[in-house]
Amino acid sequence: MDRMASSMKQVPNPLPKVLSRRGVGAGLEAAERESFERTQTVSINKAINTQEVAVKEKHARTCILGTHHEKGAQTFWSVVNRLPLSSNAVLCWKFCHVFHKLLRDGHPNVLKDSLRYRNELSDMSRMWGHLSEGYGQLCSIYLKLLRTKMEYHTKNPRFPGNLQMSDRQLDEAGESDVNNFFQLTVEMFDYLECELNLFQTVFNSLDMSRSVSVTAAGQCRLAPLIQVILDCSHLYDYTVKLLFKLHSCLPADTLQGHRDRFMEQFTKLKDLFYRSSNLQYFKRLIQIPQLPENPPNFLRASALSEHISPVVVIPAEASSPDSEPVLEKDDLMDMDASQQNLFDNKFDDIFGSSFSSDPFNFNSQNGVNKDEKDHLIERLYREISGLKAQLENMKTESQRVVLQLKGHVSELEADLAEQQHLRQQAADDCEFLRAELDELRRQREDTEKAQRSLSEIERKAQANEQRYSKLKEKYSELVQNHADLLRKNAEVTKQVSMARQAQVDLEREKKELEDSLERISDQGQRKTQEQLEVLESLKQELATSQRELQVLQGSLETSAQSEANWAAEFAELEKERDSLVSGAAHREEELSALRKELQDTQLKLASTEESMCQLAKDQRKMLLVGSRKAAEQVIQDALNQLEEPPLISCAGSADHLLSTVTSISSCIEQLEKSWSQYLACPEDISGLLHSITLLAHLTSDAIAHGATTCLRAPPEPADSLTEACKQYGRETLAYLASLEEEGSLENADSTAMRNCLSKIKAIGEELLPRGLDIKQEELGDLVDKEMAATSAAIETATARIEEMLSKSRAGDTGVKLEVNERILGCCTSLMQAIQVLIVASKDLQREIVESGRGTASPKEFYAKNSRWTEGLISASKAVGWGATVMVDAADLVVQGRGKFEELMVCSHEIAASTAQLVAASKVKADKDSPNLAQLQQASRGVNQATAGVVASTISGKSQIEETDNMDFSSMTLTQIKRQEMDSQVRVLELENELQKERQKLGELRKKHYELAGVAEGWEEGTEASPPTLQEVVTEKE
């Protein structure tokens, strides 16, 4: 502490000369270095002073530029070490502000040069912490923040001083190690905690009931918070991103402490940002972001996409108020005219309006008109007369002002007498205060005795502080070896708990000692400071009154002197009249010279305009030639790549090729229009260049799409398409070559290009998949037809089931009748459920069309969404077909000629088809739609009905098989052995057939997916759709 005080003592010279390490070099370099050090010394002393006002930005900026100039902070620290930072709190506060700016925006070596002063900053922080009022606590907390910032950037050198990093740099800082990210998050929490403590302490020290942000003292305390706001915005953003990354790698319970600490800091930061944004001081300097209403939910990974990084905006500086408005030419002309009228009026006032008929006007008597000089003389006489009148008015006005000032002086003399009376009272109070001051001095001597008795306590406190430093170093060691501590959790937990307990004991002892010292020192200083402040305020008021009296006396002397000045000005005006007469002739000579110079300038301007027009024409021609050559190069490269191997792995589609051909046709029309406009107006070349460039790129795309489409086409169409693409490329090159000369439109004929495009379009339409043969305008009608046909098929199937049930009741009895009734009843329930599903699907489709078509018709909506429409058509067909097949299978089962397995398979197929219909309907539906909920409920009803059909079929099959059990009672051993062998042979045959049938089923499904993909508009080259509900149920069985 003593070392810090001695190194920062004040020297008599307010601008100390910095001792720099100069080498023996050229005298010029030494002079430059000395000038730099002098400039830095002046700026640092102006930025860091004892006045309670905010640091001026220009002085801080000069300090920042100085660090970049010398690539370090040696000059800054050499000047700061001479300032009494430990004896003046305002000086220390402004030092912290400037040093914070240097750490953020200065040269990176500022941190390295400042590390040697870490201990001095810590000692100064502890010293200022003993003061509970004024800037003491503020300086203590700010110094702790700067110490934390230096330690953080020392441990994490990847973070710059201003904390501006990209997401990739943030990931690199953690080296892709979860332990590093864990430790980095803890350090960011500590860093942000120090920032928030300073923020909160500054606000608590201000009286928020008044407009403190517009006072100089309030701005002095609020100015450093701009740097704090910038740091807090970045730290909050990085903390959120790191916590999301940790939650993706570690369990949520492990990070519970991180989340609790983040919630606490989030609440504080949000409140401080809101309070800061309402202060008038910050509104004109910085735009403070507002945090979201609720904190991020780290347990939901998708919440990271909702996070918006807070951005602090510092507006550009306003224009200088010193700039003067520039008068326009018309305003100057009006001013000259008004002055001319003023001169005329003043001349008439002096010589009279009949001056032209004066007997001394010889020109008028002789019949000769007055020349310009006579007019000028007349105007000057009028001006002199006006000035005399103005002078008389000013004399009158000055006399009135003098009388007012005399009255004001009388009032001030009365105020002065009152002030003298108050001064006498203040002198009496001062005597009383001196008596009390003597008493305080005696008390102070007693206090010094008490302080000497506390020296032993301070030595003990220093010993305890040394123990605390050792424990803190041990704790830092433990944090750095975090990974080892995780493996030895039990032993380390015990050690950390012991260290924390010891630290708590030391902190308690240190706090008790600090409180006792603070109470003893404050009691003596508080009364002395209050009395001195009252005496100083009285002296300042007296000095202010004396200064006002001197100003008033000076204004009286100025008024008397102004009268003498007016007389001198009148004499000067008479002299100026004579000079104007001689100057008029000189101006006529200058005017003739200027006219001649104007003619020469006009000739030069005409020749320059002609040369510039020619130059612009040449540049436009060069630009057109360059654009055409670039377009030809793009097309030629596309033609050269037709045979290159990389295209083998790029399979294209015919619809992409046709889309590109359509775009080329439109581009050719636009190019012809642009060419016509260019021939009519050569200055407008932008549209022509754009059209040429667009045609080149579209042609390249068409050739590439044609080459990739050939890879999937049959050999003969592929060869034709390749040849057509080549011919189109050559025709395009020829067309572009015809644009080189500025001829008529006949030189650039696009007929050959259009023919090649027509040929490519015809081949592409032949290569389109069969599923796209339906005209888009017919899709809407086809959807309605297929849905109606499906409903009709369901109603027909229901009627047939009722008919079969009636026949079975009439012709069957016993177990067979029971089985048939159960199966047919479940089939009837299934058909009813399907009918409800179709009605719900129609309602949902109608809602989708009404909400999505806008002003278009339903047919136009279906045509616009053709692939979705084709999916609906396919699903409707599948439902109707499945219902018909199931009824046929049920009829055969009832008659005894069918298999129960066919009925189960048909049920599964109907369930899969209805699921496809539901999925196709849900694609464009609103998730909150009531019709969608009804459709999903109907789908669940279909699934339940399908399960009922399968269950009844299995039950009926088991009942019938129980009646057909074999009777082995009458068979011999040989017969049983024979039938056993036959059964084994049959089992082997059935297993072989089952294997072959499964392979056949796989091939059928593969082919079905391919055909379904083409029919429903699936993208070529994609995988097959997921298996249907029927396939899933079959595999489970």
UniProtKB/Swiss-Prot annotation:
<keyword id="KW-0523">Neurodegeneration</keyword>
<dbReference type="GO" id="GO:0035615">
    <property type="term" value="F:clathrin adaptor activity"/>
</dbReference>
<feature type="domain" description="ENTH">
    <location>
        <begin position="32"/>
        <end position="160"/>
    </location>
</feature>
<dbReference type="GO" id="GO:0032266">
    <property type="term" value="F:phosphatidylinositol-3-phosphate binding"/>
</dbReference>
<dbReference type="GO" id="GO:0048260">
    <property type="term" value="P:positive regulation of receptor-mediated endocytosis"/>
</dbReference>
<dbReference type="InterPro" id="IPR002558">
    <property type="entry name" value="ILWEQ_dom"/>
</dbReference>
<dbReference type="GO" id="GO:0030276">
    <property type="term" value="F:clathrin binding"/>
</dbReference>
<dbReference type="GO" id="GO:0099149">
    <property type="term" value="P:regulation of postsynaptic neurotransmitter receptor internalization"/>
</dbReference>
<comment type="function">
    <text>Plays a role in clathrin-mediated endocytosis and trafficking. Involved in regulating AMPA receptor trafficking in the central nervous system in an NMDA-dependent manner. Regulates presynaptic nerve terminal activity. Enhances androgen receptor (AR)-mediated transcription. May act as a proapoptotic protein that induces cell death by acting through the intrinsic apoptosis pathway. Binds 3-phosphoinositides (via ENTH domain). May act through the ENTH domain to promote cell survival by stabilizing receptor tyrosine kinases following ligand-induced endocytosis.</text>
</comment>
<dbReference type="GO" id="GO:0035612">
    <property type="term" value="F:AP-2 adaptor complex binding"/>
</dbReference>
<dbReference type="GO" id="GO:0030100">
    <property type="term" value="P:regulation of endocytosis"/>
</dbReference>
<dbReference type="Pfam" id="PF16515">
    <property type="entry name" value="HIP1_clath_bdg"/>
</dbReference>
<dbReference type="GO" id="GO:0043325">
    <property type="term" value="F:phosphatidylinositol-3,4-bisphosphate binding"/>
</dbReference>
<comment type="similarity">
    <text>Belongs to the SLA2 family.</text>
</comment>
<protein>
    <recommendedName>
        <fullName>Huntingtin-interacting protein 1</fullName>
    </recommendedName>
</protein>
<dbReference type="GO" id="GO:0042981">
    <property type="term" value="P:regulation of apoptotic process"/>
</dbReference>
<dbReference type="GO" id="GO:0030665">
    <property type="term" value="C:clathrin-coated vesicle membrane"/>
</dbReference>
<dbReference type="GO" id="GO:0042803">
    <property type="term" value="F:protein homodimerization activity"/>
</dbReference>
<feature type="domain" description="I/LWEQ">
    <location>
        <begin position="771"/>
        <end position="1012"/>
    </location>
</feature>
<dbReference type="GO" id="GO:0080025">
    <property type="term" value="F:phosphatidylinositol-3,5-bisphosphate binding"/>
</dbReference>
<dbReference type="GO" id="GO:0032051">
    <property type="term" value="F:clathrin light chain binding"/>
</dbReference>
<dbReference type="GO" id="GO:0006915">
    <property type="term" value="P:apoptotic process"/>
</dbReference>
<feature type="region of interest" description="pDED">
    <location>
        <begin position="410"/>
        <end position="491"/>
    </location>
</feature>
<keyword id="KW-0221">Differentiation</keyword>
<dbReference type="GO" id="GO:0005737">
    <property type="term" value="C:cytoplasm"/>
</dbReference>
<dbReference type="GO" id="GO:0005856">
    <property type="term" value="C:cytoskeleton"/>
</dbReference>
<dbReference type="GO" id="GO:0050821">
    <property type="term" value="P:protein stabilization"/>
</dbReference>
<dbReference type="InterPro" id="IPR035964">
    <property type="entry name" value="I/LWEQ_dom_sf"/>
</dbReference>
<dbReference type="GO" id="GO:0005794">
    <property type="term" value="C:Golgi apparatus"/>
</dbReference>
<dbReference type="GO" id="GO:0098978">
    <property type="term" value="C:glutamatergic synapse"/>
</dbReference>
<keyword id="KW-0539">Nucleus</keyword>
<dbReference type="GO" id="GO:0005634">
    <property type="term" value="C:nucleus"/>
</dbReference>
<dbReference type="Pfam" id="PF07651">
    <property type="entry name" value="ANTH"/>
</dbReference>
<dbReference type="GO" id="GO:0005829">
    <property type="term" value="C:cytosol"/>
</dbReference>
<keyword id="KW-0963">Cytoplasm</keyword>
<dbReference type="GO" id="GO:0048268">
    <property type="term" value="P:clathrin coat assembly"/>
</dbReference>
<feature type="modified residue" description="Phosphoserine">
    <location>
        <position position="338"/>
    </location>
</feature>
<dbReference type="InterPro" id="IPR032422">
    <property type="entry name" value="HIP1_clath-bd"/>
</dbReference>
<dbReference type="GO" id="GO:0051897">
    <property type="term" value="P:positive regulation of phosphatidylinositol 3-kinase/protein kinase B signal transduction"/>
</dbReference>
<dbReference type="GO" id="GO:0035091">
    <property type="term" value="F:phosphatidylinositol binding"/>
</dbReference>
<dbReference type="GO" id="GO:0099637">
    <property type="term" value="P:neurotransmitter receptor transport"/>
</dbReference>
<dbReference type="InterPro" id="IPR008942">
    <property type="entry name" value="ENTH_VHS"/>
</dbReference>
